[in-house]
Amino acid sequence: MRRQNSKIKIKNLGFTLIELLVVISIIGILASLTLVSYTGAQKQTRDTQRRSDLNQYRNALENYAGANNGLYPAGLDSMAALCGADNPLDTAFIASCPVDPLNAGGYVYGFFSSATGDAYLIYGGLETGGFWEICSNGKSGKVAVEPSSSACGL
């Protein structure tokens, strides 16, 4: 009788194939959910960096205006013109022009200024959709359509 009891105990110590498959499936589902949320968090982090970069540009432009009778660089229609070879925001106003965290096309910063230099608009594409816009009138926020002039869309 003792032998039969020991055989039964040995058989009950292992897991069935079904139990193992259920556990592996649950682990796979949890891993995929974690990966999806991690990717979303990375996008939000880069979008936060973009908003911070645009605020650096805002500060530099406001400092520029403070040193130039309240006027911003006039008639510019791109970030390349603002931060290019003829950089009106020289090192006195901004140490270096921030670039998009991904440094890959699609998510870039844009800049428009009025012909008279009394208004500007800076913006950046967001990975979570839309564009973050900062206007010379102090407004900032998310817009759905990419800006095409210095007119504030907020």
Describe every region a protein language model picked out.
Residues 1-15:
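N-terminal leader/signal peptides at the extreme start of proteins
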Residues 11-38:
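N-terminal single-pass transmembrane signal-anchor helix
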Residues 35-55:
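Aliphatic-rich helix starts adjacent to a transmembrane/signal segment
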Residues 62, 66-130, 153-154:
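Extracellular/periplasmic head regions of type IV pilus-like filament subunits
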Residues 130-138:
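Active-site and glycan-interaction determinants of carbohydrate-active enzymes
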Residues 140-154:
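Short, low-complexity, Pro/Ser/Thr/Gly-rich segments in the mature regions of secreted, periplasmic
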